[in-house]
């Protein structure tokens, strides 16, 4: 009875957590352990999976009108919302099964989960006792996952009228779903931006760390850099890194009449000037692209490169430390995927090094950008 009462009370509080548009972040200092081994990564991963599952389960109690109000929308695409929930449950089950493989080394947050019904059962019962070693983490984590779930459900509720990375239009679009457990790909948007010019610093940091990433560039930015410098200087800056395109300029490619020309011009420019770095990937600005574009992209030999983990480090959003802690929490939750940093903002110069340092002993890996999406 106590568990039922606690869960019911928590359901009532679900609707009064965060205003629509709030960006989720979590102070990782509330978690009492450093991720200094693969086992400790798994402990933290199990905790975040169970907390998110608890929040996800609670959201299913809201009817369509209540959910729309919760998300700050007049109408929602409930089919897209339910499809996202279903994909999330399957991913959570898979991830928990990976995370519980180390339960013989540390049994924290280890429960009997054999299938989706038992995961939902454990999510409904999940709570952290007041005398727990992890109590300081519990409520901040719950708030984080409630806000993060709102972000994702809102994108699904607007899909496909407003396209985003929340779902794919076909197999020609790729994200990190097919990546192996504990494997992540670093990607960077606006990666030829001139002011501020963080690209060279980021690329050099990656080289010194023996890591690479995929830098997505605008055609007009590459053209401007070539006007101010040489091809050789660009080749040196992007050495050992991969280059995809975001189109000629940063604008929605879903309703722009010249979107095809934007993609073709930028891809041809990068491929001709930086062939060793070029990878045939188009990242739609803000994830916005057309639903009927498969024929075009296949004719160009391009794939659409989406992402799974958004640092929310764009203009006016999270600062570097907040962004990094958000990313780490989502890495623990999803256990693999594509991370999407914004090189146009200075936050990346603090968030990325912190993230790489925090995970150095955790047993994760960074995907080779030349192998990703192949």
Predicted regions and their residues:
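Metal-dependent polysaccharide deacetylase catalytic core of the NodB/CE4 family, i.e.
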Residues: 116, 120-124, 128, 132-137, ...
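Alpha-helical scaffolds that organize eukaryotic protein assemblies
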Residues: 305-307, 312, 316, 329, ...
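A short, acidic, amphipathic alpha-helical segment used as a generic capping/interface helix at domain edges
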Residues: 320-332
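Short, composition-biased local secondary-structure segments
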Residues: 160-177, 253-271, 324-327
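Alpha-helical, coiled-coil/dimerization segments enriched in small aliphatic residues
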Residues: 189-190
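Short glycine/proline-enriched loop/turn "hinge" motifs that connect secondary-structure elements
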Residues: 176-178, 235-237, 330-331
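Terminal accessory/targeting
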Residues: 2-11, 15-186, 197-200, 204-213, ...
